[in-house]
């Protein structure tokens, strides 16, 4: 009887080298140097130990186009140390996603190129999608989760990308990086007693903080050290020029807020901030409402003038009721001198110019 001629036609090829001690990095280099009918787009090598301790190597190769293999010795590889020849089993891979998942299960892998999504899975069905999303949630980061969904559930990746992107932002939300003050608090050696007392009473962690702490409005000329001092007191949210309450900027676990150079005429959530109110929502222009835990004081920083000063704003005739409320929820201080002495002036001014001129 005539022996069937060896022939494999496929765009994706799966190789298995049984009882193979070749380093996986060497096999990857070997495949990259082969003269093949089509250029590889992606190669992944996996080293797997069977129960008897013998190593096997598996390889997935994705090509630009379908290839025909008639030489069953095409992928034979010689061990770099002992000249032993290793011959693989060669077969077409119906689902690259399933093969890649199999290679990834033990984690001892090396790869080259960009994995090509094929959208075919032998498992299929709802359970496969559930498994893919479970793997995405366990991936540890938004970018890794998106890669998992792109590979395993490409239809959802294309059709639901906007929702996925938004949901994963919230799931893998990272608090803003903590601010590091360029000066220790001791650099500010001309802080009025009233300011020091306010800090001692209101800028505390959640366990020691009053239930409804008082806020403070600090008005003064530029380069008096207001911003640097206010930001040196502890973990805080810094909102300058406009309010951004997105999780990327605003941290619900901060001890206090600093609102710097925001015209009080256009300050959204005036009472929520000044009154240290708890559990309130902010509607965003292009997203879902943001839930603010609140209950922390706010330092309002401003310069004199009709579009900056909170005092001038509250002295307007139409703000009479708001002024009466504000005086019960905040103290107002006007600085006439810098918060630092002459010995600290040069360094403080340099940092102030680099950060914010208020």
Curated annotation (Swiss-Prot):
GO biological process: DNA replication
Motif RCR-3: chain residues: 102-105
Main localization of the protein described in the UniProt heading: host cell
Motif range (RCR-2): 56-58
List of catalytic residues: 102
Segments for region (Binding to RBR1): 142-152
One term under GO cellular component: host cell nucleus
Record: residues binding a divalent metal cation: 48, 56, 58, 106
Region (Oligomerization): 155-175
Alphabetical keyword list: ATP-binding, Covalent protein-DNA linkage, DNA replication, DNA-binding, Endonuclease, Helicase, Host nucleus, Host-virus interaction, Hydrolase, Metal-binding, Multifunctional enzyme, Nuclease, Nucleotide-binding, Nucleotidyltransferase, Transferase
SUPFAM superfamilies: Origin of replication-binding domain, RBD-like
Span(s) of short sequence motif RCR-1: 14-17
Keyword S-adenosyl-L-methionine: no
Cofactor section: Mg(2+); Mn(2+)
Subcellular location: Host nucleus
Enzyme Commission code: 2.7.7.-, 3.1.21.-
Cofactor binding: number and manner: Divalent metal cations, possibly Mg(2+) or Mn(2+).
UniProt subunit comment: Homooligomer. Interacts with the replication enhancer protein (REn). Interacts with host retinoblastoma-related protein 1 (RBR1), and may thereby induce the transcription of host replicative enzymes even if the cell is not dividing anymore. Interacts with host PCNA. Interacts with host SCE1 protein.
Family that this chain belongs to: Belongs to the geminiviridae Rep protein family.
Record text about domains: There are 3 rolling circle replication (RCR) motifs. RCR-2 is probably involved in metal coordination. RCR-3 is required for phosphodiester bond cleavage for initiation of RCR.
Name the record gives this protein: Replication-associated protein
């Amino acid at each position: 009887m005539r022996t069937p001629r060896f022939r494999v036609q496929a765009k994706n090829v799966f190789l298995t080298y049984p009882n193979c001690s070749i380093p996986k990095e060497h096999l990857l280099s070997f495949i990259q140097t082969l003269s093949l009918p089509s250029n590889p787009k992606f190669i992944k090598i996996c080293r797997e130990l069977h129960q008897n301790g013998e190593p096997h190597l598996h390889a997935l190769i994705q090509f630009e186009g379908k290839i025909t293999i008639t030489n069953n010795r095409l992928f034979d590889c010689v061990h770099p140390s002992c000249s032993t020849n290793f011959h693989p089993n060669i077969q077409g891979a119906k689902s690259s996603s399933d093969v890649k998942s199999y290679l990834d299960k033990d984690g001892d892998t090396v790869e080259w190129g960009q994995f090509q999504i094929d959208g075919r899975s032998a498992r299929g069905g709802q359970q496969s999608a559930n498994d893919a999303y479970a793997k995405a949630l366990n991936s540890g980061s938004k970018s890794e989760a998106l890669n998992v969904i792109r590979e395993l559930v490409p239809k959802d990746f294309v059709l639901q990308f906007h929702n996925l992107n938004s949901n994963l932002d919230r799931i893998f939300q990272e608090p803003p990086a903590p601010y590091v003050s360029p000066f220790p608090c001791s650099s500010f050696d001309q802080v009025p007693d009233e300011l020091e007392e306010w800090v001692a009473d209101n800028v505390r962690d959640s366990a020691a903080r009053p239930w409804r702490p008082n806020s403070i409005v600090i008005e003064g000329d530029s380069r008096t050290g207001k911003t640097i001092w206010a930001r040196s007191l502890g973990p805080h949210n810094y909102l300058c020029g406009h309010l951004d309450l997105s999780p990327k900027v605003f941290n619900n676990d901060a001890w206090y807020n600093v609102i710097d150079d925001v015209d009080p005429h256009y300050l959204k959530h005036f009472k929520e901030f000044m009154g240290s109110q708890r559990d309130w929502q902010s509607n965003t222009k292009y997203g879902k409402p943001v839930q603010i835990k609140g209950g922390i004081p706010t330092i309002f920083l401003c310069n004199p003038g009709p579009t900056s000063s909170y005092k001038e704003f509250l002295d307007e005739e139409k703000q009479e009721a708001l002024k009466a409320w504000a005086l019960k929820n905040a103290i107002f201080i006007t600085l006439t001198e810098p918060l630092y002495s002459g010995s600290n002036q040069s360094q403080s001014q340099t940092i102030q110019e680099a950060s914010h001129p208020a």
